[in-house]
């Protein structure tokens, strides 16, 4: 496939990962992408670079560069400007596209977050290149082409997409799809600085104020340590409260399988599976979920999977670590009661032991 690449793109090399900052901290998906980017770079025999964009002198950008090297980057690109203090599409797009045009990476990876999706789309459009969104697997073929795999047709098929005649090859990956690599104390590589050639007057959007999202009801399932989810086996929408009660008792979050979203019982941000959230909690409790392959793909990275289902032949028992053949509607309240008693202060030390 590479042999058909136009001549002007044949000198593109190296793998880049955009390091996303969230409230001054590196977003976990960027660390996951550094681990995946390291594998791709090693297969191609090229360098892995972290790309950091932010305000000058900020502790966040310094930490981002340190994390990039600790998780596998050989070098980092840094764009600093007061215009980059907060995310706005125009200056971030300008910074990243100018970097790409000047340094010619072969592969550019971003997290499929709200920010990453917005930035990736505008950068790909500006550069007139291809973008494969929400990938679940990344690899390189024998000729070095990026093979970006993502679910399609509602998760019933996996499609591998190639960017044949454009560069860079761009892809976004959802949080928790890739494993988090080990942090390693490595020598600091080169830091290449680049100026943002833009004026405030050229930017249409202005940041006026920030409002705390501490009361937000939006799910953050991708990074929850404990997740309790329900499926059609719950029978009625009012039984979702059983999930919420158990999740609250365990200090976790709650979600559901795709059919409950289709019924309108829960919003899409609570959907778990190949076409929803991919999760890697320490404990995953699935109540009344049959365990179709699309759901399995989204949860199989969990440390411990506990399945509750009335059907002993349900597919979920094939990959659950612990299985309970029971009616989830009656079993969940009993389980919540047991954990509530066990987690009382006087019993907590004994429970942990």
Swiss-Prot record:
Pfam families: ETF (PF01012), ETF_alpha (PF00766). GO terms for molecular function: electron transfer activity; flavin adenine dinucleotide binding. InterPro entries: DHS-like_NAD/FAD-binding_dom (IPR029035), ETF_a/b_N (IPR014730), ETF_a/FixB (IPR001308), ETF_alpha_N (IPR033947), ETF_asu_C (IPR014731), ETF_asu_C_CS (IPR018206), Rossmann-like_a/b/a_fold (IPR014729). GO terms for biological process: fatty acid beta-oxidation using acyl-CoA dehydrogenase; nitrogen fixation. FAD binds at residues 283-311. The keyword Electron transport applies. It comes from the Bacteria. Keywords: Electron transport, FAD, Flavoprotein, Nitrogen fixation, Plasmid, Transport. May play a role in a redox process involved in nitrogen fixation. Belongs to the ETF alpha-subunit/FixB family. FixA and FixB form a heterodimer. This is Protein FixB. It comes from Rhizobium meliloti (strain 1021). The lineage of its organism: Bacteria, Pseudomonadati, Pseudomonadota, Alphaproteobacteria, Hyphomicrobiales. The gene is fixB.
């Amino acid at each position: 496939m590479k042999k058909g690449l136009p001549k002007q793109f044949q000198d593109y090399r190296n793998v880049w990962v955009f390091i996303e900052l969230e409230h001054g901290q590196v977003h976990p998906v960027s660390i996951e992408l550094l681990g995946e980017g390291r594998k791709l770079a090693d297969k191609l025999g090229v360098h892995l670079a972290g790309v950091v964009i932010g305000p000058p002198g900020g502790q966040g950008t310094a930490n981002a560069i340190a994390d990039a090297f600790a998780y596998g980057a050989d070098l980092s690109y840094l764009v600093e400007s007061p215009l980059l203090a907060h995310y706005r599409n125009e200056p971030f797009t300008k910074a990243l596209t100018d970097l790409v045009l000047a340094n010619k990476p072969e592969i550019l990876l971003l997290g499929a977050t709200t920010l990453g999706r917005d930035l990736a789309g505008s950068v790909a459009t500006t550069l007139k290149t291809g973008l494969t969104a929400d990938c679940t697997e990344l690899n390189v073929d024998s000729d070095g082409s990026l093979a970006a795999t993502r679910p399609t047709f509602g998760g019933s098929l996996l499609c591998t997409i190639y960017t044949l005649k454009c560069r860079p090859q761009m892809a976004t990956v959802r949080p928790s799809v890739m494993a988090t690599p080990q942090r390693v104390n490595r020598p600091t590589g080169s830091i290449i600085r680049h100026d943002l050639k833009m004026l405030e007057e050229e930017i249409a959007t202005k940041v006026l104020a920030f409002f705390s999202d501490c009361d937000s009801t939006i799910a953050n399932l991708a990074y929850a340590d404990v997740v309790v989810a329900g499926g059609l086996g719950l029978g009625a929408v009012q039984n979702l409260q059983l999930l919420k009660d158990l999740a609250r008792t365990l200090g976790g979050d709650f979600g559901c399988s795709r059919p409950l979203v289709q019924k309108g019982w829960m919003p899409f941000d609570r959907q778990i599976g190949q076409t929803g959230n991919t999760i890697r909690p320490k404990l995953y409790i699935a109540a009344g979920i049959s365990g179709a392959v699309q759901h399995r793909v989204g949860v199989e990275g969990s440390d411990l999977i506990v399945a509750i289902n009335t059907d002993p032949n349900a597919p979920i028992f094939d990959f659950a670590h612990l299985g309970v053949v029971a009616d989830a509607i009656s079993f969940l309240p009993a389980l919540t009661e047991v954990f509530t008693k066990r987690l009382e202060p006087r019993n907590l030390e004994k429970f942990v032991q």
